[in-house]
């Protein structure tokens, strides 16, 4: 659906209105980007920080170095060490973009151009955010061999999509600790995959797949996602998250918000419209106004094995 400026604020404004009431454009941009970042599926919100870099340790085990001991009366209770990985460092990253509104756009009331500009600015911001988050996840799945190759490309209607997804689920749920353990039953990291992330085009390949459709013949036909769409259908018991910013050749299976965390030096901020080169009735020396969006944040992958990637094509 196309974005139409003014819909979210319940009014129909001219370009001049946005210049006269500079805060209006802030609400419009925030309405698009708020809670829309696909990386939020992979990263928990770890709050604010003032540091430009963080040192962290990846999770290597859900257990201490030793099991509890049976102790005799008056015997000292033994202690065990916390198992941690090597130190890793992630630095802050700033993304920012600005949108210009010309004097001519104001005088000619080119609300269509302003609508496109606001939508494109928000999309650029979301894309940059997604790339920062997803590129790290992809690199981690390669590093830790958390990759499943599809038996057959998913664009093929006879592809064994379900088997590929279940292999990825098994990979996440059976991910093992690094190093030795005192009990093999403690070797699993204990993740529970609950979410599948994909490009919208991949979803349509799924609901058109012959094997998937066969499951809805007869009594289950009323629940067929072919007709009902995404919700409330949960394939393989997984929540479905789709985004145009995910590579169409990749699908991610994960425990939501478990792989990593994101700390903010500055949460996403949008400026009201302002004239950058001197305020005047015509927009300063360059006869323009602008609005900016920026964010400074740090992303860290604490549990890289909580996600698996399926190469679907």
Question: What does each model-found stretch correspond to?
Answer:
Residues 25-95:
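Assembly/oligomerization interface modules of large self-assembling protein complexes
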Residues 2-9, 209-313:
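Sequence/fold signature of self-assembling virion shell proteins
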Residues 104, 201-202, 246:
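Alpha-helix/helix-capping structural signal
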Residues 1-38:
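N-terminal alpha-helical "arm" segments
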Residues 92-104:
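Residues forming anionic-ligand binding surfaces in small-molecule and nucleic-acid pockets
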Residues 103-181:
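Alpha-helical scaffold segments that mediate packing/assembly in large oligomeric complexes
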Residues 174-236:
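A contiguous, surface-oriented mixed alpha/beta subdomain in the mid-to-C-terminal portion of proteins
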Residues 26-28, 192-194, 249-250:
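Short, surface-exposed beta-edge/turn micro-motifs
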């Amino acid at each position: 659906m196309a974005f139409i400026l003014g819909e979210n604020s319940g009014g129909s404004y001219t370009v001049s209105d946005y210049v006269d009431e500079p805060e209006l454009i802030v609400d419009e941009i925030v309405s698009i980007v708020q809670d829309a970042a696909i990386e939020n599926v992979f990263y928990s919100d770890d709050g604010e920080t003032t540091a430009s870099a963080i040192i962290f340790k990846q999770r290597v085990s859900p257990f201490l170095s030793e099991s509890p001991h049976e102790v005799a009366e008056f015997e000292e209770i033994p202690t065990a060490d916390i198992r941690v990985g090597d130190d890793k460092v992630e630095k802050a990253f700033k993304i920012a973009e600005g949108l210009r509104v010309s004097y001519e756009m104001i005088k000619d009331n080119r609300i269509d151009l302003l609508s496109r500009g606001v939508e494109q600015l928000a999309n650029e911001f979301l894309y940059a955010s997604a790339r920062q988050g997803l590129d790290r996840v992809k690199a981690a799945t390669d590093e830790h061999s958390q990759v499943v190759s599809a038996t057959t490309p998913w664009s093929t209607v006879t592809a064994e999509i379900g088997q590929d997804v279940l292999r990825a689920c098994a990979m996440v749920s059976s991910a093992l600790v690094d190093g030795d353990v005192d009990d093999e039953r403690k070797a699993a990291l204990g993740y529970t995959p609950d979410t599948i992330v994909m490009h919208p085009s991949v979803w349509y390949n799924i609901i058109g797949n012959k094997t998937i459709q066969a499951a809805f013949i007869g009594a289950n036909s009323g629940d067929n996602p072919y007709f009902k769409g995404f919700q409330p259908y949960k394939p393989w018991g997984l929540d479905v998250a789709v985004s145009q910013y995910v590579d169409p050749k990749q699908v991610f299976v994960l425990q939501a918000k478990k792989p990593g965390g994101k700390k903010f030096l500055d949460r996403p901020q949008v400026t009201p419209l302002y004239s950058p080169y001197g305020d005047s009735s015509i927009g300063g020396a360059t006869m323009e106004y602008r609005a900016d969006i920026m964010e400074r944040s740090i992303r860290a992958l604490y549990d890289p094995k909580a996600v698996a990637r399926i190469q679907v094509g």
